[in-house]
């Protein structure tokens, strides 16, 4: 992020760090490169690169959840009712169908450390 101004999530989505700030400690507005050079001189650095690791983790988790949603639909025809963070809520006929969705979600992205998915079944979302 510091040198190229970009990181990529697990599935290749770009997260850009295009703004610049002075290297001196203090409260300064992050600006595009040309404006930052005019405002702060040559002693500038990329702004916000301390957020790169979090963007990588959160962005990759979002990629995985989105891919799981698409794979569940393509492989089962089931459309999730709602997605919250890393959770998909679906209506299923039986536990077998729920376990199929679980398997799809666990394998939608190949990882060295596997993802584990919990399933909860109930007559309604309140159970």
Regions found by a protein language model. Name each.
Residues 1-127:
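Conserved catalytic core of nucleotide polymerization and phosphodiester-bond processing enzymes
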């Amino acid at each position: 992020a510091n040198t190229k101004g970009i990181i990529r999530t697990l599935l290749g989505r770009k997260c850009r760090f295009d703004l610049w700030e002075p290297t001196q400690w203090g409260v300064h507005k992050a600006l595009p490169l040309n404006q930052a050079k005019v405002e702060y001189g040559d002693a500038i650095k990329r702004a916000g690169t301390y957020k790169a690791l979090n963007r990588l983790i959160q962005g990759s988790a979002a990629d995985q959840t989105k891919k799981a949603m698409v794979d569940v639909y393509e492989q089962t025809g089931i459309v999730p009712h709602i997605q919250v963070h890393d959770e998909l809520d679906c209506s299923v006929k039986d536990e077998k169908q729920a376990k199929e969705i679980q398997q799809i979600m666990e394998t939608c992205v190949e990882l060295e450390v596997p993802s584990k998915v919990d399933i909860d079944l109930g007559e309604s979302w309140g159970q």
